[in-house]
Amino acid sequence: MKSVEDWPLAQLQAEAETIRTRINALRTSLSRFFVQKAELIDLMCVAAIAQEPLLLVGPPGTAKSDLVLKFKDALGLAEADYFEYMLTRFTEPSEIIGAIDVKELRDGRYIRRKEGKLPTARLVFLDEIFKSNSAILNILLTIINEKKFYQDGAPEPVPLKILFAATNEIPEQGELAALKDRFVLKVLSRPVQDNYFTELIDSGLRGEAYRALNQKPWVEAHATLDDFLKANRYLTYQFAATRSTIDGADENDRLKFFPPDVFAEFQRIVKTLVREDNIFISDRKLVKLYKLFRVRAWLLSGGTVTRSDLVLLAYLGESLAEVERLREKVPLLLGD
């Protein structure tokens, strides 16, 4: 099997439109098995292509974990490539990255038995992520930031590509600020029973029946994890490219795919959110936002960023109040 580094640009260019079609088929197919969750599924696909963590926020029973499980199933992912865990303040590192190998310890080496744990997974789902204690927090930050963990004091790469996390609430504690900042996008999973009572009953009943019968009709072989990895690699090649125009000038990704009027609108909205709502947007987050805009534009329309892609600014909140406020304000700023 080829690694990501072995996929040449020419091959990815030839496959790009087919890959995009397959991912969109998965996106629309999954939406059929949920009530009013298309927004979340779209963001899951964008985050997965960009390889940026996504935080699902909402009360219990709003399909957060079910969305991730069905997404994993739809990819046809092997169990060895998937890890999920519900965190508590009592969670120990061994539950996440593996127990200490006693035999190795007798020989003076501090080695963890990582098989079946987070360090071997390519898709990870962490429920109640903000319940992390300080030991877990440090491990997660190293894995998210640097894609590595430590064995016997030496860094070892992890294959993590997609990270989804869920929380019932977004805490205010300062020690969690670094972890929160790693989730550029935070999306609400809202209860739908008030407006979609009948649809919820019908969909929920079908879901219970599928589980009882061990059926997974959402597994329709539309897209695989490799499709998402190839999409990421293809877009990364584009981000790195500098092209010469017919008049000999250099044209980078922004000049080619981000029209000046849309870019100016991006700047205007960011400045408005910082000035009027005191939203903190780090320099790192701005760069990641650009990447996410481009991924969304490529997935939904094939390339050029439009004003509709700027809706991702609605998911920047660092607290539940900010998440709620931006959900209302950003569409207004966009004139939607």
What kind of region is each of these model predictions?
Residues T88-D107:
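Conserved NTP-binding/hydrolysis module of P-loop NTPases
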